[in-house]
A protein has these predicted regions:
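Alpha-helical, hydrophobic structural elements that either
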Residues: 1-151
């Protein structure tokens, strides 16, 4: 449309498609070799750790129970909790991939702690078609606590 009375409308036909060449530096992702270390307990095993400057992926396998029976906390070298962005779970619910922020580039290690909440039955709620039990967390038990070198 025109702003002034003498302006004319112009139509341009064409496409906005264009290509941008992108190269991915695969050397940015560093996979920590855990084969030489025993990073497991009777309940939990850390399968792999993969780190980029932007994120970290910790792959955890649960030997007893499944992923929702436990809570994973990851600490950096200074004892600060590393923020977890998301987790994905395998179909059998035994393996969990934890996506978190990357530790500092100067960090030599991380600490992985797996906790099992201790629950106490608070109340039972009976509905017409089902019953539900509500629990209170009264504590937690560390079932896995290891410092893992990442350099």
């Amino acid at each position: 449309y025109g702003v002034n009375a003498n302006d004319k409308s112009y139509y341009k036909w064409g496409t906005w498609a264009f290509k941008i060449p992108v190269t991915v530096d695969k050397n940015l992702r560093k996979t920590i070799d855990l084969s030489e270390q025993e990073i497991e307990s009777d309940i939990v095993k850390v399968n792999s750790i993969s780190i980029t400057p932007f994120d970290m992926i910790v792959d955890v396998n649960y030997k007893i129970g499944n992923w929702n029976d436990y809570r994973v906390v990851i600490y950096d070298e200074t004892g600060q909790i590393i923020q977890i962005f998301q987790t994905t779970v395998s179909e059998d619910k035994k393996t969990e991939k934890i996506y978190s922020q990357a530790p500092s580039s100067e960090s030599n290690s991380i600490r992985v702690v797996v906790e099992k909440p201790i629950l106490e039955e608070k109340e039972k709620v009976e509905n017409s078609n089902r019953s539900e039990i509500i629990y209170d967390e009264i504590g937690k038990e560390a079932v896995f606590d290891k410092v893992i070198p990442i350099k």
